[in-house]
Amino acid sequence: MAAKIRRQDEVIVLAGKDQGKRGKVSQVLPTGKLIVEGLNLVKKHQKPNPQLGVAGGIVEQEAPIQASNVAIFNSATGKADRVGFRFEDGKKVRFFKSNSELVK
């Protein structure tokens, strides 16, 4: 099955502490989760490692978000949208269901 949300897609968060915020997908995990740039930030306590030159402290990093809690953002309508698939010229392409425009 093809992925409806892929890397570099702009998504909007539907549920959770970052609800309503938008960002680009930086990574799609095989567990059905996404990492979105600048969203779902958590604080991680980093242990210092002098061999690698890593300073210790509290570091903010992006945590995965469940794919069902985000939707692809349609810049033409300015809203969250659903994705469908169709064949054009023998290739499978993604399109927005609200206005039938191709994704990217």
Swiss-Prot record:
Highest taxon of the lineage: Bacteria
InterPro entries in alphabetical order: KOW, Rib_uL2_dom2, Ribosomal_uL24, Ribosomal_uL24_KOW, Translation_prot_SH3-like_sf
Pfam families linked: KOW (PF00467), ribosomal_L24 (PF17136)
Record SUPFAM superfamilies: Translation proteins SH3-like domain
Keywords: Ribonucleoprotein, Ribosomal protein, RNA-binding, rRNA-binding
UniProt record, GO biological process: translation
GO molecular function: rRNA binding; structural constituent of ribosome
Signal peptide extent: none
GO cellular component, one term: ribosome
Purpose of the protein: One of two assembly initiator proteins, it binds directly to the 5'-end of the 23S rRNA, where it nucleates assembly of the 50S subunit.
NCBIfam families assigned to the protein according to its UniProt record, in alphabetical order: rplX_bact
Family per similarity comment: Belongs to the universal ribosomal protein uL24 family.
Assembly notes: Part of the 50S ribosomal subunit.
Protein name in UniProt: Large ribosomal subunit protein uL24
Native source species: Shewanella halifaxensis (strain HAW-EB4)
Annotated gene: rplX
